[in-house]
């Protein structure tokens, strides 16, 4: 459980930092995420950007990129059959999604879609982390008072976001 908490905290930091390809680059030298990015790279969870060699710490993370990070962090490899209308077997992220679905930490977005290239939201990340921990969130919804956009948090994610705040994964 401690290992899961460790990786979940790092993955949450990666989400907050944005897309985090790892290679020593000047664009991250003074960025708050540098120690997290460095650790994730050393653990083999993230790779350098082949095209730029930069970290781009303020860029967004897609849903499939976050799934890839989680699959690597937890060494998930077992696959499920999937049939999302927006995911084809020839897509580069097909196996990543098969693995994520098999391990039960992500669902589609409704209407038989996965939206793999969509930007991962805070509520989606919190829900994924909660499902990875397999906990029943117990944190009070008052934990969400720190967010000016709390009214925009989907009902399915409210308890997971509150728990992620309580656990210190997001703030």
Listing of model-derived features with the role each one plays in the protein:
Residues 2-36, 42-96, 102-124, 129-158, ...:
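Feature responds to low-complexity, polar/acidic, surface-exposed segments characteristic
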């Amino acid at each position: 459980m401690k290992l899961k908490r460790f990786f979940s905290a790092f993955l949450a930091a990666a989400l907050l930092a944005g897309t985090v390809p790892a290679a020593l680059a000047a664009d991250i030298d003074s960025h708050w995420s540098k120690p997290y990015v460095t650790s994730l790279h050393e653990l083999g969870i993230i790779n350098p950007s082949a095209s730029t060699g930069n970290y781009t710490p303020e860029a967004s993370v897609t849903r499939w990129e976050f799934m890839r990070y989680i699959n690597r962090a937890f060494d998930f490899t077992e696959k499920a059959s999937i049939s999302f209308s927006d995911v084809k077997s020839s897509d580069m992220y097909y196996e990543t999604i098969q693995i994520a679905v098999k391990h039960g930490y992500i669902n589609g977005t409704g209407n038989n879609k996965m939206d793999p290239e969509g930007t991962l939201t805070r509520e989606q990340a919190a829900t994924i982390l909660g499902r990875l921990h397999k906990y029943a969130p117990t944190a009070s919804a008052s934990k969400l008072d720190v967010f000016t956009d709390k009214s925009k948090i989907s009902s399915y994610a409210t308890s997971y976001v509150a728990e992620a705040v309580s656990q210190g994964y997001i703030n």
